[in-house]
């Protein structure tokens, strides 16, 4: 059985770990659009505020450690652009190379996360107004503080 998981932060990483416990022989491929997986996204404000002093403490797993522990193939900087449920294939864009390829699956799990709501307020798009959802948002905020 081959599982493809879209999203590698909280839900996707948890699903992958659970799948491995349930099926030791399954092929599991996890796609994450961002650079990091399985990080403490609830800790991001604490890092900005200095309560968590070391950035590395935000990261629970790396792609390498996740593979070593769970035998899950993790592909970061990989955006799933299209799902063909009938053919059981996803189209993936490798954000490093710009190349696009297809990956087949038997079962698909979607855990792509969310986007912050930006209310239609005057000035919401001005410099110095930030949303906080991921590590990249955190880094951008800290540059301006």
Model-assigned labels for residue ranges:
Residues 1-77:
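Beta1-alpha1 glycine-rich phosphate/pyrophosphate-binding loop at the start
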């Amino acid at each position: 059985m081959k599982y493809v998981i879209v999203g590698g932060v909280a839900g996707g990483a948890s699903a992958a770990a659970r799948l491995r416990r349930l099926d030791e022989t399954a092929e599991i491929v996890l796609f994450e659009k961002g650079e990091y997986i399985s990080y403490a996204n609830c800790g991001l404000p604490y890092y900005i505020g200095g309560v968590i002093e070391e950035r590395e403490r935000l990261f629970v797993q790396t792609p390498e450690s996740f593979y070593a522990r769970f035998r899950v193939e993790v592909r970061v900087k990989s955006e799933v652009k299209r799902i063909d449920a009938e053919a059981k294939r996803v189209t993936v864009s490798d954000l490093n190379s710009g190349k696009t390829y297809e990956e087949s699956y038997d079962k698909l799990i979607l855990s792509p996360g969310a986007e912050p709501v930006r209310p239609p307020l005057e000035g919401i798009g001005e410099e110095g107004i930030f949303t906080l959802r991921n590590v990249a948002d955190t880094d951008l905020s800290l540059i301006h503080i």
